């Protein structure tokens, strides 16, 4: 009996350790990025999380870089895991989703090939800024995107939002949810139903711990589309003076520190179609004008000949 009492403290200690271990395991998640695999294998049992697809250790106290997030999304598609599976229309730009190459800091490399023989150069946001070429294409640097314009169109409301209230709410959102320094949100414009949010950040302005405007814009875009990257959150719930802000369309424009290098091949099918329609219309107009003039000229000649014939047939006095 005494021996059983001696073992009781040891059993309680083992039970406490097991409970602590299970609790640590259950709390080992990344609140700012659910596309991670977390464990307590860090030094001293510390929770550490690695991005899916790249296995890069991420800092869960801030936003994960856009390059690592795109890498994780492509990994989720390939593995069939239903984490953040966007619709086929939920693309970042006209080129759609691709499997990016990231450097050791999680930033986009200057040249991207999507694991194919076709390559192109991208900016710091990962958006193509040159024509596509082969693997001999050289991209000397990653040109920084210093200005991002987010354009939103909200659903019809009983009355327009107050501009000042809307401005304050969006600034609070970017500061509290995306940890973006207030100085990097330069302006909020509003003309019902269009809202424009301007983010500006030069390389010299960004500190070591500052969130990049590219990452903040990407997290915001996923939130707006109901595909939140935050752990345990379902989309975005923004209210202005108690009135919910429901967004039905999002467009994001990127301005780089250097102009893009596109050739005339960059013309889209839509632009080419417009040019073709205008050209056909001009040619048709010219043809109609020429035919009309010829018809009028022919009538005049017939009248002149008829009058001349009548004059000849009249008897002389």
UniProtKB/Swiss-Prot annotation:
Glycans are attached at residues 27, 114, 162, 202. One of its GO terms (biological process) is positive regulation of stem cell differentiation. Expressed in kidney, lung, ovary and testis. High levels of expression in immortalized keratinocytes. Disulfide bonds join 67-102, 113-119, 121-139. Residues 64-139 form the Thyroglobulin type-1 domain. It is found in: Membrane. Pfam families: EPCAM-Trop-2_C, EpCAM_N, Thyroglobulin_1. Keywords: Disulfide bond, Glycoprotein, Membrane, Signal, Transmembrane, Transmembrane helix. GO terms for cellular component: basal plasma membrane; extracellular space; lateral plasma membrane; membrane; nucleus; plasma membrane. Residues 292-317 are cytoplasmic. The chain crosses the membrane at residues 271-291. InterPro entries: EPCAM-Trop-2_C, EPCAM/Trop-2, EpCAM_N, Thyroglobulin_1, Thyroglobulin_1_sf. It is a single-pass type I membrane protein. Its main location: membrane. May function as a growth factor receptor. This is Tumor-associated calcium signal transducer 2. The gene is Tacstd2.
């Amino acid at each position: 009996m005494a021996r059983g009492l001696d073992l009781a403290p040891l059993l309680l200690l083992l039970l406490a350790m097991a409970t602590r271990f299970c609790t640590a395991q259950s709390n080992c998640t990344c609140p700012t990025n659910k596309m991670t695999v977390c464990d307590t294998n860090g030094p001293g049992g510390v929770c550490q999380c690695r991005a899916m697809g790249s296995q890069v250790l991420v800092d869960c106290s801030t936003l994960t870089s856009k390059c690592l997030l795109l890498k994780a999304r492509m990994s989720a598609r390939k593995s069939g895991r239903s984490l953040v599976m966007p619709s086929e229309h939920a693309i970042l730009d006209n080129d759609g989703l691709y499997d990016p190459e990231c450097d050791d800091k999680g930033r986009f490399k200057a040249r991207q090939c999507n694991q194919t023989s076709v390559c192109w150069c991208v900016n710091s946001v990962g958006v193509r800024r040159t024509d596509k070429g082969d693997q001999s294409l050289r991209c000397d640097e990653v040109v920084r995107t210093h200005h991002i314009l987010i354009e939103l169109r909200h659903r019809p409301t009983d009355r327009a939002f107050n501009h000042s209230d809307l401005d304050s709410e969006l600034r609070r959102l970017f500061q509290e949810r995306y940890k973006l320094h207030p100085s990097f949100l330069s302006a909020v414009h509003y003309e019902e139903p269009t809202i424009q949010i301007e983010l500006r950040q030069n390389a010299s302005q960004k500190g070591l711990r500052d969130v990049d405007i590219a990452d903040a814009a990407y997290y915001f875009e996923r939130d707006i589309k109901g595909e939140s990257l935050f752990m345990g959150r379902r989309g975005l719930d923004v209210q202005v003076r108690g009135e919910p802000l429901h967004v039905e369309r999002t467009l994001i424009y990127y301005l780089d520190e250097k102009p893009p290098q596109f050739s005339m091949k960059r013309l889209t099918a839509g632009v080419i179609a417009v040019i073709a329609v205008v050209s056909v219309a001009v040619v048709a107009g010219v043809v109609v004008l020429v035919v009309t003039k010829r018809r009028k000229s022919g009538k005049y000649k017939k009248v002149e000949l008829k009058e001349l014939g009548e004059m000849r047939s009249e008897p002389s006095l």
